[in-house]
A protein has these predicted regions:
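Compositionally biased terminal segments of proteins
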Residues: 2-201
Length: 201
């Protein structure tokens, strides 16, 4: 979420306010309908790769022994790494054997993954090109998930709203309100549950 938000700011030429960040890092996969552009014989153990970073991230292991969709650092409860995908009718985790990883299916995630773009994440060591949701879809998705968050995640929910408002303000200030409005209409046209949650945000 936050890293995508920051990368969207880079793409749009905007520096966001400080209060819009969380320490979650999310990796999203669009589900079974999209192939990852990797060689067919490539095997990567995500757990080993994360362990090599020496950040203290431990997997929340599933019952089947696979590294779970979430990693946490016991010393820093704010730092969390999530591997997510769209929720299907089966509501089961998507297991990626070549990565030794299970992805957590999330409601409404498909909205962000339907139209993606590329952006850049910068660090002291350089830059990296990443795939991102279209900014308008990212913002509308944040409004939708606001309605899904439990009271225990109210601080995170408020950051969802701040991120959505920041992006919506960008579109309004730059004469592109129609771009945001098209994404909004798409979301609320998907049914009562979508509309109710979006309007809560």
């Amino acid at each position: 979420g936050t890293h995508a938000f920051l990368a969207l700011g880079n793409m749009l030429g905007v520096r966001w306010q400080e209060g819009a960040a969380t320490l979650d890092v999310d990796f999203a996969h669009a589900g079974r309908n999209i192939s990852i552009a990797l060689p067919a014989d490539l095997k990567i153990d995500v757990h080993d790769a994360l362990e090599s970073l020496e950040m203290g991230l431990l997997p929340i292991v599933q019952f089947n022994g696979k590294a779970g969709a979430q990693y946490r650092n016991p010393q820093d409860q704010e730092l969390r790494l999530d591997f997510v995908t769209s929720k299907s009718r089966g509501h089961r985790s998507v297991v990626m054997n070549d990565l030794n990883l299970a992805l957590e299916p999330l409601k409404f995630m498909e909205f962000s993954l339907e139209q993606t773009t590329q952006g850049c994440v910068f660090s002291n060591l350089g830059a990296c090109i990443v795939n991102l949701p279209a900014p308008e879809r990212f913002a509308v998705h944040k409004l939708i998930v606001f309605g899904e968050r439990p009271v225990s995640e109210r601080a995170k929910a408020n950051k969802d709203l701040l991120q959505a408002a920041s992006i919506a303000s960008y579109f309004l200030a730059n004469g592109q309100a129609d771009v945001f409005n098209a994404a909004w209409r798409d979301a609320i046209g998907r049914g009562k549950g979508w509309r109710t949650r979006a309007e809560q945000g």
